[in-house]
Amino acid sequence: ETFCGECFYCQHGYVNNCTSPHGGWALGCRIDGGQTEYVRVPYATTGLNKIPDSVSDEQALFVGDILATGFWATRISEITEEDTVLIIGAGPTGVCCLLCTLLKNPRNIIVCEKSKDRREFIQKHYPQVMVVEPEDCETFVKEHSQHGGADVVMEVAGGPDTFQLAWKCARPNAIVTIVAMYDKPQMLPLPDMYGKNLIFKTGGVDGCDCGEILDLISQGKID
């Protein structure tokens, strides 16, 4: 992601919405060459970060994306140590959201995943995290949260029914962060959710946290 650093959106940290023709999702989208060995990067002084000597190329591989997506989603979700956080989807992006959620040390983390292999991966590597299948998720979350639902929900799966699952599992006045991208439009049943007073957050990642992410990797806080 490239950004000018000078427009209204960049000045407020919303670099995904940079108004420059060469800002936002430019490189590899509107500008060819994203998969080549060498690329000419617009606004390199604002958008590039030097990899510290203490961080290997392998560790840095996902910093620009998808680890940046998990970091951004966690930041805008306003997670506190008292929260129960539900992450829907344990694919690569879901795991990145989990890694960044762990930094916030919430009361409970629940991961909902339909794949047996992915559930076993979470259970093996993150035993402190609770894991549940989609069909049991709503009941499980209500039983393992303080206020009848998750305080924060991150929807990272992008499945046909996962958006509906996300808001149903959220407690009243919760934050529901839509990290996933969908193939089809999603229905927003406002009459059904009227009394829940939910806060929805969504959009493309603002990829301006890479320096902080590299520091966290260097310190061993993100593995």
Language-model features, listed with the residues they occupy:
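Helix N-cap at the beta1-alpha1 junction of Rossmann-like dinucleotide-binding domains, i.e.
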Residues: S115-D117, P160, D183
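Glycine-centered, small-residue-biased loops immediately flanking beta-strands
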Residues: D83, A174-I175
